Structure formats: C-alpha cells, structure tokens
C-alpha cells in the first residue's frame, strides 16, 4: 500500500482571522477519497494551531509566549474541526505532536514509529503538528521541514505540500525581495 504525506499550511487553513472551513472541507474530502477510493495511507501534517488560536484571542504573534499560548488554544480547536469533518466520512483521526528533540531520541522516534504503524494499520489518519507549546524554536524552519522529516521517518512514498506560495524559492520570499523560483 502506498503511503502519502500531505502538508497543509496556515495560509491555506485560514482566511482573514477565521478558519477557512470550506477549504478544510475540500481537503478532508480529498484525503477521504485518497484513503477510501485509492486505498492510500495518508498522513496529514497540519499547521494552523496558532492561526486557530488567534481566532479566539488576539495576541501579538511575534512574541514567543503569545505564539505558544495561541497554539495551546488553537490546537484543540483545529483537531475538533478535523475530527468532525472526517467523522462525516467514517474516518477516525489521531493527533501526534513533535518537537525537534523527538527525532534525536531513538526511544521517542521508535515509539512514534510504533504508534504510526498501529494507526495506519487500523485505517486511522494521523494529524501531525509541531508541539508549538513547548518548542522554543521552530523545527529547523517550519512544518514544511517537519513534513520532510515525517516523510523520511515513516517511509512515505510521496510528500505533497499545499501552500499559498507560487513554487520553490531559493530563499524565503517574505523576507527577501530578490527570492527567485
């Protein structure tokens, strides 16, 4: 059976200061089709916890403690939304949160691999995010990097990144005006 990692960014999951529910429904519909009709194992790496938290509490997202607070508020809101949407297709979801140290620890990475295999064997869709509440710096960049790690560690056949960026840039186009595709 083929294994696919899909990473979705905050910009796709939010619209203004709200969750983009129609986009999320479209994503859930796509994943459900891939899982049920195409018989693929799907792992979802989802950003959006901070954005979802911001829909409830307006804090300055440039302050680390505020960002962590927003993630603490937003992660359960995001998971509840996913759970309700996937439930319409009869699909169970599970949450897995990681920090960079988890990939440096043989014991933790082995435990995560064991859990992942059990989830996928039982047709559960794992939804993965960085554990922003305890992370003091983003995992070597962001959830795009996390998705690459997940693809490698869990031996996925393909990684698909859903984003609002036009393509692969040689540097971050939000920080460098001379970034090239």
Question: Language-model segments: which ranges?
Answer:
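Nucleotide/pyrophosphate-binding catalytic subdomain
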Residues: 1-181
């Amino acid at each position: 059976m083929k294994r696919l990692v899909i990473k979705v960014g905050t910009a796709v999951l939010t619209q203004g200061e709200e969750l983009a529910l129609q986009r999320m429904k479209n994503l859930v519909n796509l994943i459900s089709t891939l899982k049920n009709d195409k018989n693929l194992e799907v792992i979802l790496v989802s950003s959006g916890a901070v954005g979802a938290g911001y829909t409830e509490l307006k804090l300055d997202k440039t302050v680390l403690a505020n960002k962590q607070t927003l993630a603490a508020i937003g992660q359960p809101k995001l998971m509840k939304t996913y759970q309700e949407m996937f439930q319409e297709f009869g699909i169970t979801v599970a949450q897995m949160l990681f920090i960079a140290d988890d990939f440096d620890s043989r014991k933790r990475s082995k435990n995560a691999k064991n859990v992942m295999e059990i989830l996928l064997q039982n047709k559960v869709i794992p939804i993965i995010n960085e554990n922003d509440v305890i992370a003091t710096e983003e995992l070597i960049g962001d959830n795009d990097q996390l998705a690459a790690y997940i693809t490698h560690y869990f031996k996925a056949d393909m990684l698909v990144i859903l984003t609002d960026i036009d393509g692969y840039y040689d540097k971050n186009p939000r920080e460098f005006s001379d970034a090239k595709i």
